[in-house]
Amino acid sequence: MMVINSVVVGTVVASKNVNEFEFVIENQVIDKIKKGEFVITKNTHGDYLLSKITKIVSVNALIGDKSEDASELAKIRGVIYSEEMLNNSSKFLASAKILGVINNESGSIESNVYPINVPQNVYLTKDDLLAKIFSNGSIEVGYLKVRSSTKVKLNAKELCSRHFAVLAMTGAGKSNTIAVLVQELFEKDKGKMNIVIVDPHGEYVKMRNTHILPAKLNPILVPEEHLAKLLGIGENSSVQKSFLVYAALTVKYECKENKKQISGLEYLKKIEEKLVECADKIANSEDKKRIYIEYYDGTRCRXKTVKKDDEMSINRVIEKLRWFINKNKNILGENEGMFDIKSDKINVLPLQKIEDEEAITIVGEFLKRVLKERIKSVHDEIVEIKALEKPTLVIIEEAHLFAAKNLKDRSGYWINRIAKEGRKFGVGLGLVSQRPKELNPTVLSQMNTKIILRIVEPTDQKYILESSENVGEDLLQDLPQLSTGEAIVVGSSLPLPALVKIKKYDGVLGGEDGLKNLKI
């Protein structure tokens, strides 16, 4: 493969180190050169170097350091030099970052350790070389912004197995990006891998080839401490929490002893019955100082002394339990339908009608089951969910809600587990967020490919930089200037970071701007 293009675009005039250089752009090709363009030079070892233009400035030797003095400039332009002389003395100086040595056979890029000679020619990179670098994957997401003829294709295995994140401010195009990724993955690997989208706002339910998974909350699978949180029992309400735990453990123990299986609404109703029994016993007790109740702790029966004042606390728990049941009656029940995953469909788990805490619990239980089933599959154990014999990619929208910084919630715990262990068991993660700084930094750092669309908030930019090894300051500087649908793609699924124009998804999404037709 020939590396050198016949088009000379400039001459090297300075080389600061082995990582960067400056060159003067030839006037006749200035219209072909722009920031982000790729160019070729040689190092002193004779290797071809691929570099990217990071800055272009205009300089004029006749003006020199007088460019900030308005009166001096006026004299220069009107008296000392003619406009023609000034124009002829104007040059464009480009700064370039050396990306590495080009392997002439494979097109791969290796680190450079040699300086470059001054002066020497700078060449425009050929399309076929850029295609060898950026079009070698199977997942086409768009094209290079600086070279629309070069398609950008990601490595599907690296993208899914090593996890990815799509980060953007609202309206920058993240939903379209996910739709493009999912459709490409579905069409290229149909039936080989499960794809599930956790969809808090119903943005993806209208996509082609979707299969809707009904979101269900089975409270018997929820730890008692977390059930208290769902009911709105605060951390400081220790008495209320203790009575809820006593009642829940007792119900579970009695069902086990009677070999009776219950779940969903029936489980909560049984807890309510136990709490009512306890409150009635306190209310009807003649001995106001020594009142005993019995409960099971999961292994045996225990007795507990309660006070008359505890009746009020128990009644408060009953009120909260009834409120919770009434609010969530449509989602309480067996959750087996939530795992009716179809390998030949794009599976969507819509959560738009569910409150945050309940959604967090549902997602936590879903991720837990997916990971545990995949672990069984890898260890050749019997898998209860047939589809989970295959590798599975779970894409989570509004990921900052489910993987917040403290990881206290159940969803955060399982997202962290999958981020660290999922690759071994064939579970991939895709996290999508418009609030990067609210994501757990450990989880974000495990996302080995990042697709970053427009972000203007400095704290978000800094947070991305701190949690990503392969995102540099030079890339972050471009984020505020990106247009809708433009993204910086960096990580293991692409050989080099690239500024990409994401292609348009050719179907229907449900998350369009609700105010777009408003006339003001």
UniProtKB/Swiss-Prot annotation:
Q: What is its EC number?
A: 5.6.2.3, 5.6.2.4
* One Gene Ontology MF term: ATP binding
Gene3D superfamilies recorded: P-loop containing nucleotide triphosphate hydrolases (3.40.50.300)
* Coiled-coil residue windows: none
Query: Any idea which positions bind ATP?
Result: R162, G171, A172, G173, K174, S175, N176, K501, I502
Is the ATP-binding keyword given for this protein?
Answer: yes
Q: Which SUPFAM superfamilies match?
A: P-loop containing nucleoside triphosphate hydrolases
Main EC class of this protein?
isomerase
Give the highest taxon in the source lineage.
Archaea
Q: Which UniProt keywords apply?
A: ATP-binding, DNA-binding, Helicase, Hydrolase, Isomerase, Nucleotide-binding, Plasmid
Catalysed reactions, semicolon-separated: Couples ATP hydrolysis with the unwinding of duplex DNA at the replication fork by translocating in the 5'-3' direction. This creates two antiparallel DNA single strands (ssDNA). The leading ssDNA polymer is the template for DNA polymerase III holoenzyme which synthesizes a continuous strand; ATP + H2O = ADP + phosphate + H(+); Couples ATP hydrolysis with the unwinding of duplex DNA by translocating in the 3'-5' direction
Membrane-crossing segments per the record: none
Family according to the record: Belongs to the HerA family.
Instruction: Kindly give the PANTHER family that the UniProt entry links to this protein.
Output: HELICASE MJ1565-RELATED (PTHR42957:SF1)
Job description of the protein: A probably bidirectional DNA helicase.
Q: What's this protein's name?
A: Probable helicase MJECL08
Q: Which organism is it from?
A: Methanocaldococcus jannaschii (strain ATCC 43067 / DSM 2661 / JAL-1 / JCM 10045 / NBRC 100440)
